[in-house]
Swiss-Prot record:
Disulfide bonds join 255-302. It catalyses: Hydrolysis of terminal non-reducing beta-D-galactose residues in beta-D-galactosides. This is Probable beta-galactosidase C. Cleaves beta-linked terminal galactosyl residues from gangliosides, glycoproteins, and glycosaminoglycans. Residues 1-21 form the signal peptide. It comes from Talaromyces marneffei (strain ATCC 18224 / CBS 334.59 / QM 7333) (Penicillium marneffei). It is an enzyme of class 3 (hydrolase).
Amino acid sequence: MFFFRFLTTVLLLFNAKLLVAQSSNTSSPVHWDKYSLSINGERLFVFAGEFHYIRLPVPELWLDVFQKLKANGFNAISVYFYWNHHSASEGVYDFETGGHNVQRLFDYAKQAGVYIIARPGPYANGELSAGGYALWAANGRLGGERTRDSQYYDLWSPWMTKIGKIIAANQITEGGPVILVQHENELQETTHRANNTLVLYMEQITQILDAAGIVVPSTHNEKGMRSMSWSMDYEDVGGAVNIYGLDSYPGGLSCTNPNAGFNLIRTYYQWFQNYSYTQPEYLAEFQGGYFTPWGGVFYDDCASMLQPEYADVFYKNNIGNRVTLQSLYMAYGGTNWGHIAAPVVYTSYDYSAPLRETREIRDKLKQTKLLGLFTRVSPDLLQTEMEGNGTSYTTGANIFTWALRNPETNAGFYVVAQDDSSSTTDVVFDLEVETSAGSVNITNIGLDGRQSKIITTDYKVGDTTLLYCSADILTYATLDVDVLALYLNKGQTGTFVLANAASHLKYTVYGNSTVTSSNSSQGTIYTYTQGQGISAIKFSNRFLVYLLDKYTAWDFFAPPLQLSDPNVKPNEHIFVIGPYLVREATIKGRTLELTGDNQNTTSIEIYHGNPFITSITWNGKHLSTKRTAYGSLTATIPGAEAITITLPKLTSWKSHDMIPEIDPEYDDSNWVVCNKTTSFNAIAPLSLPVLYSGDYGYHAGPKIYRGRFGSTNATGVTVTAQNGNAAGWSAWLNGIYIGGVTGDPSIEATSAVLKFNSSTTLKQEGSENVLTVLVDYTGHDEDNVKPARAQNPRGLLGVIFEGSTSTNFTSWKLQGNAGGEKNIDALRGPMNEGGFYGERLGWHLPGFEPSTKSGWDTRAPSDGVDGGSHRFYITEFTLDLGPNSHALDVPIGIHLNASSTSGPAVAYVWLNGYKFAHYLPHIGPQTVFPFQPGVLNIQGSEGHKRKNTLAVSLWALTDQPAALDVVELVAYGKYTSSFDFARDWSYLQPRWVDRSKYA
């Protein structure tokens, strides 16, 4: 807690040079000082959100996400560029195919009107396999990763050069959206010496990016308040970036205990003043949610992470700390499709983010929008000094106040929250503020539990100035008149005074709020009690004030008329209240064209202030409007509530054995021979030959091994596998299941002693025994996992005979994903497939035709599999949403459930070739898996059938049978939409070709 009241007290903590604002000296239009970023000479509050295009493999949907974030107050997107997504093998890069086409990312950002903060690594983290390192390099070849090691440099520098040039071509200097470029990621500068290996490594990154043509400011993100790294203002010995950033995940929230956490950090300001005092305060990653692990609580069931109150209190606290650059991690999480995840996460990467994995808008995003729209129109907020903070501003000591003051305009911003930020008690208090008319005691300010407010003084609204206002400002517009929007919780009291206005202006109130006026020495005080819905005050000087309750404010949009400009001015947007989403607002001739999405039939209100507009359309259809007494227009737009969605039943299954490799006579002549006695990896194997899959070019996905040995008196084998948390494995001797491990969410390396039964499993003398081991895979480790970090090996660490020292394997062979590093399915990329038999043959791909002549039958997943067995199932379906399918957004997923008698199992689901579900029913937590349009085909109006190929594999990990008694399509919400999701997506769905050589 900080109980000092005045800036002079604060200054005792810091060096006098804190007062000196340092400007940037880059050659780009992006500049900075100690207050904020400036672009083209205008200060900007950077309200960014993290988005990972790798987790949404349909490029067209990137625009959908960007439009939703822009409409909800964001003006920038922070993006990791993952090396492993673009490079399947050394020297090979793909920046053009499908979801690898990063130019489309930049183009969509420009179209939506959002800036890009580029984060190219080379190490990224982000709960992605190997933290984003190319998997072909993460097999031990990286050497001294994240150091100046020349072996490491030789591998990462080509990547950074190539992606650096692409980013450079899309900088704001070139007409693109990129305004900042981050060097590395959360790299802690533990030693401040010029010859330190980390310093030299950061210098190498700077040199590579400079040579690639990067001229916008560089940034870095400190890994919490643990070290002081790469700031020009603190022990700069090299490697420092232009703008220091801090990552913070302060919530301390619990999915199982709703009363836990919710504790604010109130020391950001002090931290930045100590370590980056000439730079704007930048929270490069601020908690927008959090990931949950295998065996944890699923995101939809974690109410504490989804609460909109978190966005209200924590993001306003950042404002109080004088932060002017903020990026929420994540804004949209997406899906860990294929095998892109690190072992700490499962298929969903929803992250409890403001925008759901299904691309649906959560209440948390609606609440976030209220602050985003406020910062967009508040330039005085971008040049403030800390006037003071503490509990002495209010009556009673239970309210904490941040007091910020713009020294040039005298505008003040008082951020108030309960001192105990986790309190759920409602409180009422008075607040003393300073205004241009002197000190004022604002009375009767209410805070509900877990609520925060920004009280403003001397705040300009066009030609009008608020001397003070105790309600939250949502936004304002300067149109034909000045229009202000305020919001409060229903029943709360707000007061405001108009500076330099005539006393007792006449006014008319519309709606359910009650308004009174009274005299004061500073002017007329207007006091109101917030009613439900929309209220408005029309003053005789034409000033218009909207009074909105919080839930109505959630449905408030201020779409800009200049779509591609992220820096929206008050005279460049209009107001639309009521829809689920407003994507765009454009004026063509005398028509205002609105596009967007809507859930239920809704009354909307529009204030555009343009006398030349004579008609309004919504998604191309003319609206019948009525004019209100205060100049807005009202209309009704349709929703999707009356549309019946009938999902097809998944029937007509075809099934085939998925583990023919356990047959001792199986032909593995085309498999890779494991014959290495040394490894790229520094971790010594437990036995020879080396069985690390990465040494043989197989990286992502399950792998299968076959080891041969002669007659033996051994009593068994000890198998040790390492394939990520929760990854299980099974073993068969001469076609007979002999055991395995079911996987543990807290352990990534597992070992088991498998006993031989000589009477049933071992071959007689002179014959050959075959041990087959099938291993699951949950990803490569990130940098924080010892001993070898992202280079921890995958596959089998060793297989050792028990009871015999003379028995040895005569050979080992291995199969992984078809083609290994050749990346034979370039569009879906190098991390989509694994080494299951049916995958290698392409059974999961559209166009594959199962034939009863080749061992296929009509069993369904509900029929199940015997213990220690593995089957593949395939069916087709058509999704017809009706004649208006092009104007609907109906997120679809698949629900899986193991039967009550099912043993531990692994189930995978592929849709049109994309692996979109990794289901471990004995571990959890996920049971419903969303499918994205583009991966999913939706029947259009063109007439031809757009089929979907759905494939399921079911693997019983023990000798217990396993079955899926539920495999069904489910719908999430349904919305009318201007975004066409029922397109021809065939370019994203390459069809089956013969792959028999990979058997």
